[in-house]
Swiss-Prot record:
Carrier domain boundaries: 965-1039
Pfam families: AMP-binding (PF00501), AMP-binding_C (PF13193), Condensation (PF00668), PP-binding (PF00550)
GO molecular function, one term: phosphopantetheine binding
InterPro entries: AA_adenyl_dom, ACP-like_sf, AMP-bd_C, AMP-bd_C_sf, AMP-binding_CS, AMP-dep_synth/lig_dom, ANL_N_sf, CAT-like_dom_sf
Listed name of the protein: Anguibactin system regulator
Described purpose of this protein according to its UniProt entry: Bifunctional protein that plays an essential role in virulence. Plays a role in both the production of the siderophore anguibactin and the regulation of iron transport genes.
Family of the protein in this entry: Belongs to the ATP-dependent AMP-binding enzyme family.
Pathway assigned to this chain's UniProt record: Siderophore biosynthesis; anguibactin biosynthesis
Amino acid sequence: MNQNEHPFAFPETKLPLTSNQNWQLSTQRQRTEKKSITNFTYQEFDYENISRDTLERCLTTIIKHHPIFGAKLSDDFYLHFPSKTHIETFAVNDLSNALKQDIDKQLADTRSAVTKSRSQAIISIMFSILPKNIIRLHVRFNSVVVDNPSVTLFFEQLTQLLSGSPLSFLNQEQTISAYNHKVNNELLSVDLESARWNEYILTLPSSANLPTICEPEKLDETDITRRCITLSQRKWQQLVTVSKKHNVTPEITLASIFSTVLSLWGNQKYLMMRFDITKINDYTGIIGQFTEPLLVGMSGFEQSFLSLVKNNQKKFEEAYHYDVKVPVFQCVNKLSNISDSHRYPANITFSSELLNTNHSKKAVWGCRQSANTWLSLHAVIEQEQLVLQWDSQDAIFPKDMIKDMLHSYTDLLDLLSQKDVNWAQPLPTLLPKHQESIRNKINQQGDLELTKELLHQRFFKNVESTPNALAIIHGQESLDYITLASYAKSCAGALTEAGVKSGDRVAVTMNKGIGQIVAVLGILYAGAIYVPVSLDQPQERRESIYQGAGINVILINESDSKNSPSNDLFFFLDWQTAIKSEPMRSPQDVAPSQPAYIIYTSGSTGTPKGVVISHQGALNTCIAINRRYQIGKNDRVLALSALHFDLSVYDIFGLLSAGGTIVLVSELERRDPIAWCQAIEEHNVTMWNSVPALFDMLLTYATCFNSIAPSKLRLTMLSGDWIGLDLPQRYRNYRVDGQFIAMGGATEASIWSNVFDVEKVPMEWRSIPYGYPLPRQQYRVVDDLGRDCPDWVAGELWIGGDGIALGYFDDELKTQAQFLHIDGHAWYRTGDMGCYWPDGTLEFLGRRDKQVKVGGYRIELGEIEVALNNIPGVQRAVAIAVGNKDKTLAAFIVMDSEQAPIVTAPLDAEEVQLLLNKQLPNYMVPKRIIFLETFPLTANGKVDHKALTRMTNREKKTSQSINKPIITASEDRVAKIWNDVLGPTELYKSSDFFLSGGDAYNAIEVVKRCHKAGYLIKLSMLYRYSTIEAFAIIMDRCRLAPQEEAEL
């Protein structure tokens, strides 16, 4: 190896880095502890008919000419200039006689080796000797030390030397040392605590929130990918002309096209972009790092590109001329500490070399990598054409996403560079055409015709064809089709006698049983609309629903004691009396487009809202499912869902329309897997339809108690909440050929709107996907600006088609807010978040607002907060849902110290829950009540919900009542069982099983141990009586007699 002494002298041996260089190097160090990533710029150029000696001599001249190439980048964040340095002979790979495929492989291997190298050398050079007297020059620069214009200058000077022209002398006052000291001295004058500096930082939006598939720190290696867009000289000049016409620079025009594309893939109107600006006016001809990054809040969407680009020009100029210098290293550190949205700030960058360059040679290949940059766009002029270089760390992003973004950028660039383009026109859609095509095809699948029947009509047709077939089984009771129809007609007659007319609303308020089904069929036969109102909620709330729905008649069960009227506004009719009335001879004529039922869901203002569903909307869903899964007369469903939960609509009308059988459990057995297994095995149930948590409970119980019940189920349909990734395989452990169906939708869209048949569950799945729209239903994934989101981009799920509700009963404002009519199509804004996969599959990503699902129930946290704030002495309350998939409710309360009584005892968690039980259904009462002095706040002064979530993990004991010790033998017995199941923990009378760490699996184990000890406990009892004190009382009541215990 030849070694030549570097000839230049440098005034100092140690030079501090600038803020920008510190940031680049520190980010690189963070990501290179165990990974392979460095900051570099790499270029390849071909040189024809030039000898290797000539090329080596010219390169050596340039390296000797620039002091920076003699430096070493050390671990102490300094550049060191040794007194004696050496230039190594350049590596050579002779491929002059190689075959083309071997040359291609060798060049690819060279690129891979060079780009993955962790070398900190300032410059690395290699030759590849190719056929036809061509030398491929490979040059890698350390970009912490050498910026983009310096790379350009390097190759310009090489061209200059090869043409025989000497290099100009360097000005001894224009040095890297002078520049670094100048920049660092300016930084010393910046007050990082000043209001102006902080004002700038706090007003910056987050970087584009692009979809990712992994965190960069977890990458073992990083492959940088370069993609290029070339704009012809003619189109480039047209773009420049139009830009100048509108008083914007071409650079801002290109950056604004970039921000428009980033806005669509990031689902945000405003985003932070890093401009890498090189200020070299006083340092012309020097190679070094002169970049001063500028963070600019850019607009990504306006009504027209003209307004967008003008806005961005203004924002850029304001940032560039800001009266307080904003150093990038300090900016990034500040932003990273503000919120999670700034976890990776300034990771997308724009830079350009449009003013001073026109490369005579075009690079054969190149790329640019930086540890703190995920995606960069660099604009240069090569041979009079605009070349836009996209460099991306593709491993961070979903496959082909950057390629799709590039295509959308190209389309918009091409449009804006047309000769007579009008930039004031509305921006076109940038959704890639192939994505739009896939979605249109999926949204039009299926040949199901819109039904012209009523929801109950097929049941009554089946009565004629199979009158003696079993319609309902409930324990030891059963009804055949003709008897059920007779009861329904008599019920309709009784309703008519009570003054019910076609279109009236009639409430059904009774516990689960045959009466519920008789009631809804009777109401529909009478031409009325059924309104299920659960008994499991305070009377005050029930009556508010009755009044809001304009209900006069309420069908009840004669044995339900909760249905005692508080006034004479309502007429209560028990179904047992109703079926003794004179039957209605023929059904009331109603149009299929008219309402069939109204289901009331939680409302954010504290008032429940009534979802109005038509006959044809609900029946369309039932028919689609029945046809898809060939539901018929031999099928039986275990109907677990409450009547006010719309899964019950399919349980009733899906099965009765197909000639099948409904198998019921009692109200107390709705959470009892013992009863479910018995019913499944005894009555040969073939179908399961519930929220995932209940099916999980069934499988868990079956495993613990060796039940074969799951093997009876040929079809399992789960919806209403997250579906565990383990459930499909656990089900198929019982039935290999079983069909496992994931479904989703909204009450406002007729039960379900999408379906997915789950076969295998790939390891990379985050959750079971939503799948595809049902026939005559459509989906869109829409961002906050009303644009269709590209693949992988999270947006709000909109449902369209024939299942859309008629609106919210007697609430035009809420209806207009959630139901939209666009270009002749009706859409319901679900408030759910989702995204498309490239094949058109929909993935559910959770809620976007304060609505949550707990145990399958849709709950508005705002309604809970209204109820909490109604409690005397409460200054402010916040409700949250805790947990990822299996959520529970928690409430945080700050008491009003001025209004709260001083003498009386303070409000405790148990009292709060008792007061809430008077206003809300039991499933809406938070399990955890935590009292605070003040609420934690974000940097923007809003309640910090993430901090509250963290508190729930530390404050489990505060959510329970005053810790009274365990006294009775029964309580001690319960505590021993709980400790055996949950592990040793301190328990009190008020200790709650589920707040003490119990889950569904643990609950089943407790029931199992109770049985062994001689207590015939049902699982539902533990859910209903979940404290030590309450469960001990129930256990005593369930003690078996000695001979029964012996038999057990």
